[in-house]
Amino acid sequence: MDKIIVTALLVIAGVTAAALVVTTLTPIIGKSSRSVVDSQKDVATRIQTDIKVIKAHASDAENATAWVKNIGNANIDFIHLSDLFISLEDGTKFIPLTNGTSTDNRWTTDKDGSWTKGETVKFVLSIDSGDALETGKTYLFSFSTPNGVASEYIFTY
C-alpha cells in the first residue's frame, strides 16, 4: 500500500513539474519565434532592395546632382533617412550630406512616399563653400538606403 501511495505522489509531482515547465517555456518560445520571423522579414526586404547610382556630376564647386535608380524588387520607404556622401577618391576629403535645407552640406529631393521598383530619383546636393569641390579632382558619390544597401559613382569636377 505504501508503494502505491509513493508512486501516486511521484506521478502527481511529475505531472505538476511537466505542466510548470510547459507553462513557463511556451511564452518564451512564442516570443523567440516572433523575433526570428521579424528578423527573416528584414533580411528578405534587404535582399530584395537594390539601387544603382546612374549619374552624378557637379555643376559648380558648391552644387551637384545625382540620379539613383531603384533596381531591386522592393519599394524603398523613408527615403529621407538615406545617407549621402561625397569624398575624394583618395579618401583625403570626406563630405557627409544631411537631408534638409538648414545645414551647410545638404541634399534634397522632390520624391515623397515610397520609392518604387524601376523609379529613378534626382538628388540635389548643396556643398558649403568651406568644403567646395576642387577642379580637376575625382570624387566618389556614395548613396545608402535606410536598410544599408549602398551604391557609389565616381565623377570628376
Predicted regions and their residues:
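N-terminal export/assembly leader peptides and their processing motifs that target proteins to secretory
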Residues: 27-157
